[in-house]
Amino acid sequence: MQEIEYSFSPEIAEADRPVVLESRIYREWLEASQKKFVVTKVHFSSVDFLRKGRQPLFIKLTATATLPDGRPVHGIVLVRGNAVGILVVLRCEGQKYLLLVRQPRFAIGEQASLEIPAGILDWTGDYRKVALSELKEEAQIDAEESELIDLMDFWYQGKSDGFAASCGLLDERIRLYAIERDVTPEQLRAMDGKDQQYTEEIEWIRTEVLPYEEAARQFVDGKNLIALFLYERWQQSRK
């Protein structure tokens, strides 16, 4: 394996540098990259840490890398690791609804971005466990693992952990699931408009229940649309 020459921008503290190099998200990115590319240098431009635990959340780096035949490739990467997303489909009196969340998304200038419940993969690497945790945390739903419909396994037949969110910059792959629930009108109303505040993570979340088609036409978040597409293909495959 090619030895890598490392460098760090001055703003990354000396004490944090070993933490970055040993972080799960960096090691997993590097391992995957070295299977297909020759990496000779990595310069770390900046690192954002989790507010609790001092683990890297985002790692901005520039690598010097080539294809095996020596052709150079663009090496700017924002490393953040993988994530999960869950499409929650509710059936009530013959109609379908989606249980979604709204939250501020500063990067796209949205105070209340409409999204499926989602979250980053934690140190366990257990996608299903994280999916169930996010359903509870964001959507206030207690679900069993047996309820999860693995849309990635259905579509990729075990060949990929998820779809690439922004393959020109991010290493992130998002694994998508769906769950289906039959609910009463009272339960449907109770799921709408629930507020969650997680000040340590700077998250302000409100649930929103919308008719299936109405919700779909409001989506601008890519993972929402892909989850919807895969769910509908999964449904078609069962007919």
Language model features by range: what are they?
Residues M1-E115, I120-S133, I141-K239:
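N-terminal leader/linker segments that precede catalytic domains of diphosphate-processing enzymes
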